[in-house]
């Protein structure tokens, strides 16, 4: 089925129809009169340059029209234009004096504060050290013996050797310890503390017995050493006397 539509306002699309009849009625810029010879030299115009006219003060985004011409002044950065104010705080061409700008951080805050001096530990009172359960003269006595042995060995002569040179000295025996008493048998904390105290006493007693046994062995070895030294001196003197007589 064919429909016949009468369009009196539009001319027929024929080869001889003038192009000026199809000009834009809204904007005379787009009304191009190309009725002349088609073989004449006409400059090509891209859609981007058509939109960048004085009548249209803004250009569309880069996604609207592709860039069909060489870069122009409209495509450059606005920072290089004379009428563009990049920041209200700085005037035009004020970037050359950047070294004269005030610092964001004052010099007083940037200077490092001196490190505080380390406080020396406060001395422990003698009464508090004696009352402390972790301080025991018997536990620290073996640690002091090597230094005492070095001092005595450096100051004593070879002829006056005795058991103290080897780091053995008489142990100081304190007063007998009081018996462990528990007032309330239902007190679990007190019972546990009493058991720990009894175990510590037994351990110290075993250590004391072991130290006594070692001291006894050291005394016996010192006596045997002195006896052997005397015999060696006797035999040396006898050998030297016989050698002198044989010569």
Swiss-Prot record:
Where exactly are the transmembrane stretches of this chain? none
Output the InterPro entries linked to this UniProt entry: AP-1_TF_bZIP (IPR050946), bZIP (IPR004827), bZIP_sf (IPR046347)
Q: Name one GO cellular component term.
A: transcription regulator complex
Coiled-coil annotation: which residues? none
Segments carrying the region annotation (Leucine-zipper) are: 214-228
Tell me how this protein assembles: Binds DNA as a dimer.
Protein name, as recorded: Cross-pathway control protein 1
Protein's organism: Cryphonectria parasitica
Task: Name the lineage.
Answer: Eukaryota, Fungi, Dikarya, Ascomycota, Pezizomycotina
């Amino acid at each position: 089925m064919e429909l016949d539509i009468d369009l009196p306002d539009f001319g027929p699309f024929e080869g001889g129809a003038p192009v000026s009849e199809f000009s834009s009625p809204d904007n005379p810029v787009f009304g191009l009169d190309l009725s002349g010879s088609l073989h004449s030299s006409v400059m090509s115009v891209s859609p981007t340059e058509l939109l960048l006219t004085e009548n249209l003060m803004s250009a569309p985004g880069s996604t609207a029209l592709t860039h069909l011409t060489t870069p122009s002044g409209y495509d450059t950065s606005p920072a290089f234009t004379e009428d563009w104010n990049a920041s209200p705080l700085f005037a035009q061409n004020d970037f050359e004096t950047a070294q004269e700008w005030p610092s964001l951080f004052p010099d007083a805050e940037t200077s490092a504060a001196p490190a505080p001096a380390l406080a020396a530990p406060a001395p422990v009172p003698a009464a508090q050290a004696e009352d402390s359960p972790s301080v025991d003269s018997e536990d620290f006595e073996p640690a002091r013996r090597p230094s005492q042995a070095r001092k005595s060995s450096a100051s004593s002569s070879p002829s006056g050797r005795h058991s103290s040179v080897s780091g053995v000295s008489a142990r100081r025996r304190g007063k007998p310890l009081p018996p462990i008493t528990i007032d309330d048998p239902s007190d679990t904390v007190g019972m546990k503390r009493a058991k720990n105290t009894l175990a510590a006493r037994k351990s110290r007693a075993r250590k004391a017995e072991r130290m006594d046994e070692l001291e006894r062995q050291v005394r016996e070895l010192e006596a045997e050493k002195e006896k052997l030294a005397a015999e060696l001196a006797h035999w040396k003197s006898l050998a030297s006397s016989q050698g002198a007589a044989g010569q």
